[in-house]
Curated annotation (Swiss-Prot):
The gene is rplW. GO terms for molecular function: rRNA binding; structural constituent of ribosome. Transmembrane segments: none annotated. One of its GO terms (biological process) is translation. One of its GO terms (cellular component) is cytosolic large ribosomal subunit. It comes from the Bacteria. Keywords: Ribonucleoprotein, Ribosomal protein, RNA-binding, rRNA-binding. Belongs to the universal ribosomal protein uL23 family. The keyword Ribosomal protein applies. This is Large ribosomal subunit protein uL23.
Length: 107
């Protein structure tokens, strides 16, 4: 019986800088509620970014301590362009939970 091998890490084609990972903050009514009550912040992120990439980018750019990162891949919506049906691009969202002593001020 052979030993179970751990999975090999996935090699990425490109390395992303912190400012390339976080594309923009998502400021919505629900996001502002999360920021004030639960100390959680939402960002639109690069589609190839991992949770570890997002954690390092937020800690580097905002000088805060990240406890948890949750990610979602959102499907693009169907949109009409005159008489043709098109689609918007798929995008990725991250919800970042911070340590209770830390805040991001622009929300």
């Amino acid at each position: 019986m052979s030993a179970i091998q751990p999975p090999k890490p996935v090699e990425r084609k490109i390395e992303l800088e912190p400012h390339q990972i976080l594309l923009k903050p998502l400021v919505t009514e629900k996001g502002v509620h999360r920021a004030t009550r639960n100390n959680q912040y939402a960002f639109q992120i690069h589609r190839d970014a991992t949770k570890l990439d997002v954690k390092k980018a937020v800690e580097h750019l905002f000088d805060v301590k990240v406890l948890k990162v949750r990610t979602q891949t959102r499907k693009g919506k169907a949109r009409r362009f005159k008489y043709k049906i098109g689609r918007t691009s798929d995008w990725k969202k991250a919800i970042v939970s911070l340590h209770e002593d830390h805040r991001i001020d622009f929300f």
